[in-house]
C-alpha cells in the first residue's frame, strides 16, 4: 500500500465529507419532507448527478468490464438502452408521480390498488434491498478496493478477512451519510463524487490506451480497432451475455423497472423542484448513460488486450486501474470508487428507510405516528438493514456468471411483475386490486419456475419478457371479469409546479437517434452495413442539440415563475 495512494485517497474523501457537511449544515433533516425528499428542492443538474452516481457503482464498474473482457462491446446495451426508459420516466411516469405528490412508489400503488398491494411491494423491495442488492454493492466495492490497495497483503491478513474489513468500513460510511444526513446530504456528495467519477472514469481508458500503444494514445486506438476488432461489435449474438433481441425486449422491461419504478432511483426525481426540472434531470441522465460504455465497457476491452490470462473476468477493471494509472491517481480513483459505492449504498438505504417508516410502520404498527417519529424510525430501520447487508455481503464470493448478470437475474424475480402492475394501473383505470395481487404472484412463480427450476435454454431476459406478457393477459382478464366499481383518476396534489419542460419531446427524439447512432456506428465492426444509418442518426441528434442551445439562449432573460402550493403561479 503506497503512501501517496493513501494520501490522495484520504484527501479526496475528506474533501467530499467537509463540503457535504458545509452545504447541509442548515438543511432541515428533522422533518419528513426534508429528510426523505430533500424538501422537494432538487434541480436538474443535481438530479442527474445523483441519479448517475446512485446508478454507477462498483457492481457495474467491476461487473460490466468483466463481461466486456469475456464477450465484447455488446454488453453496453445494459447502459445505452437506459436512454429509452429514462424517456419513459420523463414523459409517462414522472408526471403522474409528481401530480399525486407521492413520496414512494408504494404510495401510488396503495392509492391505485389497495393497502395490501402496497405492503406486498414494500416487503419485496425491502427483502431484495437487504439480502440481494446492497450486499452485492458492498462486496463488489470491497473487492475493487482490496485489489487497488492490497489491503490484505498490507495488513497481513487473508483475502477473506480483508473483504470483511472493507465491507464493514463501507457499510459504516454509508450509514453516516444516509441515516444521519438524509437525501440532501447524499445529493450534495453525489454531485462532488460525480465530478471525480467522470474525471477518474475517463482517465482509466485513456491511460489504458496509452499502455496498449506502448506510450502512444493513437497507437492504442489503432490496436483497439484493428486487433480483435470484432470485440467492438455492438450487436450481441445468441450466445453472448446480452443478445440484441434480449436488449430490446426483456432488457427494456428491466430498465423500466430500474429507472421508472425502483424507489432507490425514482426518489431522486420525486425530490425535484418542479416537473420541468425532473424531466430535464431524467433526460440529462439519458445523455450521460450513452457515454457509459467509455467508462464501464471500454476498460474491459483494454484489459482483454493487455491481460488475457486473468483468473476471473471480474478482476479486469481493478487490475487495469492498478497497473495503468499513476500511483497518486490510484488513490484518487480509489476515493472515487469509494464514493460511488457509498452513493449507491446510501441511496437505496434511504429509500428502504422511507418505505419502512412511511409504508409499513405508519400503516401497520403505528397509524398515528408523528412526522418526527417517522424520521426516527426510518433512521433506525436504515441502520438495521445496513447491518443485514454487511453480514450478507462477504458470502457473495463466488457469484456464478459474474456479479452483474447474477444480480440482474435475482432482481428479475420481482421487478418485471412490479413494472407490469404499475403500467397497467396507469393505462387501464378499471383494473382492480385483485388483478395486481394475482399478477405479482403469477409473475414471481413463473419466473422462478422457468429460470431456475425447469432448465429451459432461454436467456433470462426473454423469460422476463414472457412473464410480462403473461401478467398483462392475466390483469386484462381479471379486469374484464371483475372491474373496479369506479375508474381510477389522477388528482393533482399541487405538491410541485406541474408545467412540463416545453422541449421535452424534442430532446427525447434527439436522444433516441443518438442511441441508434451509437449502436449503428459500432455495429460496423461486426460486419453490418450500418454506416449510413449511423451518420443520419448523428446528424438528427446534432440538429436537436443546436436547436436546444439556440432556444435556451433565446429565452435566457425570461422571468422566472414562482410556484405556490395552492396551484396558482406568480411571477
UniProtKB/Swiss-Prot annotation:
Record keywords: Cell inner membrane, Cell membrane, Ion transport, Membrane, Sodium, Sodium transport, Symport, Transmembrane, Transmembrane helix, Transport
Top-rank lineage group of the source organism: Bacteria
Periplasmic domain ranges by topology: 25-74, 140-162, 213-240, 305-324, 402-415, 459-460, 527-532
Membrane side Cytoplasmic: residue ranges: 1-3, 96-118, 184-191, 262-283, 346-380, 437, 482-505, 554-571
InterPro entries in the record: Na/Glc_symporter_sf, Na/solute_symporter, Na/solute_symporter_CS
Family membership noted in the UniProt record: Belongs to the sodium:solute symporter (SSF) (TC 2.A.21) family.
Protein name (record): Uncharacterized symporter YidK
Organism of origin: Escherichia coli (strain K12)
